[in-house]
């Protein structure tokens, strides 16, 4: 293989954890938290300040509650499934492998579920959802490079609660909070922060459901009725990192800046794919192509061994790390296009 004369400044194109902001360094983090008791007033106030910043930056309604979960987004979504769901039939929208995973978790609990699934690059039917059902969906699926686009399809007279995994869309897409009752995400995607902590955002309707389910048997670590902000000991270094990345995001210009940055990044890859004859987008309709992750299939049949050699070469030469397709998805290329990625590195 021919070594390129020009290389990327950063070869980090993983879809999570993602590349750090360029200005990030360990020395830039506040270390005054380390060694402090996590339930002390000092730390409690620090967490409150971060959550308030988060709500302001993301325009989360003031009457929505923000909670911390262990186990990143996975822990957050399990907390929601166990604590909030089960009373009503659930319409699950599945177009990526994470949505399928969460649907299988719902099945294990024997909740009533209407499954609308498509894993072939097409979006399942979104309209005519029973208003009394709960709704469950992933906003952006990095395993398929697809996104729900918007949630205008959710009925205005929806009496069931709406649950969404927004990990790969928050900070990049315009989230319609008023239509979401339980939204979960982690820190390690759009803003390049550290993993292992999940955020849960609950609407007043979700909080009412939580009260209704108060007597439900739920494992302590994921019981949302059993916490105010945090349930176990968080990493205070990760909190400091999160605050740094939030500040970086805000100073760059927030959502308007990030949304444009992602669109510009994706456009670079779209033009690249259109100009070659060996790759194509997995997502069939352009409007469902994700802002944060692009996923491409090979048009012609290729041998996995040969493609693995290419991936190894790109990694060895520090050109591109971690661009293999998701492990359950068809063989292809998956590249993160979030706001920490530089356009010139994609070029």
Q: Across the structure, where does each feature detected by a protein language model lie?
A:
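Conserved N-terminal alpha-helix of the aminotransferase class I/II PLP-enzyme fold
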Residues: 27-79, 83, 95-105
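Active-site C-terminal subdomain of aminotransferase-like
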Residues: 188-272
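Active-site phosphate-binding strand-loop segment of PLP-dependent enzymes
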Residues: 120-171, 182
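PLP-dependent aminotransferase-like
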Residues: 75, 82-135
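Conserved active-site segment immediately N-terminal to the catalytic lysine
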Residues: 177-188, 198
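N-terminal "arm"/small-domain region of PLP-dependent enzymes with the aminotransferase-like
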Residues: 1-41
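Conserved C-terminal alpha-helix-loop-beta "cap" of PLP-dependent enzymes
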Residues: 274, 278-344
């Amino acid at each position: 293989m021919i070594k390129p004369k020009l290389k990327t400044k950063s070869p980090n194109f993983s879809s999570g954890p993602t590349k750090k902001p360029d200005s990030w360094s360990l020395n830039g983090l506040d270390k005054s938290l380390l060694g402090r008791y996590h339930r002390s007033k000092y730390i409690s106030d620090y967490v409150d300040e971060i959550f308030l910043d988060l709500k302001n930056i993301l325009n989360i309604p003031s009457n929505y509650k923000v909670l911390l979960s262990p186990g990143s987004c996975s822990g957050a979504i399990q907390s929601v499934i166990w604590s909030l769901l089960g009373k009503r039939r659930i319409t699950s929208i599945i177009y990526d492998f994470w949505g399928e995973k969460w649907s299988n978790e719902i099945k294990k609990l024997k909740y009533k579920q209407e499954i609308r699934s498509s894993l072939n690059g097409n979006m399942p039917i979104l309209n005519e959802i029973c208003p009394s059902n709960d709704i469950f969906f992933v906003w952006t699926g990095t395993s398929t490079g697809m996104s729900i686009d918007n949630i205008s399809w959710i009925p205005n007279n929806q009496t069931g609660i709406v649950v969404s995994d927004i990990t790969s869309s928050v900070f990049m897409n315009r989230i319609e909070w008023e239509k979401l009752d339980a939204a979960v995400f982690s820190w390690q995607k759009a803003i390049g922060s550290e993993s292992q902590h999940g955020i849960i955002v609950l609407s007043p309707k979700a909080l009412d459901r939580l009260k209704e389910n108060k007597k439900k048997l739920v494992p302590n670590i994921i019981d949302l009725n059993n916490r105010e902000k945090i349930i176990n000991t968080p990493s205070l270094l990760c909190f400091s990192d999160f605050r740094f990345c939030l500040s970086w995001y805000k100073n760059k210009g927030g959502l308007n800046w990030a949304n444009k940055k992602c669109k510009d990044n994706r456009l670079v890859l779209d033009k690249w794919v259109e100009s070659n004859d060996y790759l194509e987008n997995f997502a069939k309709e352009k409007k469902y192509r994700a802002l944060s992750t692009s996923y491409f299939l090979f048009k012609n049949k290729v041998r996995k061994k040969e493609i693995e050699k290419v991936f190894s070469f790109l990694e060895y030469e520090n050109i591109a790390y971690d661009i293999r397709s998701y492990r359950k998805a068809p063989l292809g290329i998956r590249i993160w296009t979030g706001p920490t990625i530089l356009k010139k590195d994609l070029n």
